[in-house]
Amino acid sequence: MAEGAQGAAFTAELRKQVVTGLGHMFGDAESSVWIDFSDHSNVGDSAIWLGQVQVMQELGIEIAAVVPTAACTLAVIGSTLRRFPDATVGIQGGGNFGGLYSNHHQARLAGLQASANRTVVQAPQSVHFVSDAAKDELRQACRAPGRLATAVRDEFSLKRMRDLDPAAILLPDIAHCIAPLTAPPPVKAVQILRRTDREAPPAQATGLQGNRDWLRDDRLQRLAWSARSATYRVPAGRSVFSHVPPAVYTRIAQRRVSRGVAYLAKGQTIVTDRLHAMILGLHIGRRVIAVDNAIGKLRAYHHTWLEPLGAPVTFAGSWDDALRLARSDT
């Protein structure tokens, strides 16, 4: 089977599992308020958001309001929920459950506290506790009155999460639910995208010079984000963002994903240590050579979902090995 057709086949299977699982988690909900929208240049977070939008549309659940991470205070979330008393609360999926990123950690704590006596759905996450204190904070927050439905996206995260939520379930990453992507044909054999943040693995390979991460918007997006960021820093201004139409956040995410896909599509083979570069690369029919990140996120996900379905992903033990493997195939 060609890589493009193979990708379409396993993507359809993973998408089906996500939609079915989240359908059970949201139950008979008719509307939702989503918190912890990541207004950040990371393309992976935007792909997750677009996947969430697609699932809500398929389930017939309105997205009534969105609260970005930087606006996720107890006061802002509380006032937003009072505007939508019947809405189910969704917390954005991703790879930040456990305190690895303090802004997302605090947003999740505030969201769980503000949502007492509501149904709260945590979309699929990777779980990595950075400290006992972070784990204890989340344990207490998960005990808030109401119904908490938690999904995690790999078997290792499920084991970690069961201590906090014994009913947690396993679902694929929600980015698999993104609408079909259009990618130009490759213009070179290999395209490299590597992390430059705290999750980056050791990168001794000399061939990495000049290759980049995708943590940078284009100029127009950077200017727009700077304006939003200035408002985020003003307590009185944060509530403004919960009144922004959800479609605005979706357009922001679409621009970021388009930028990421255009970068990845240049190569016939993609070499990366980013989970969503791996996922998006598969979506556009590319072969992927993966290097695990610093906390084992990629291998855990591959072991749980992609390997059993025969996805065209090859793992390398280091960046040096990955580059040698990529060059040997060209």
Language-model-detected regions and their locations in the chain:
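Active-site anion-handling motifs in enzyme catalytic cores
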Residues: 1-330
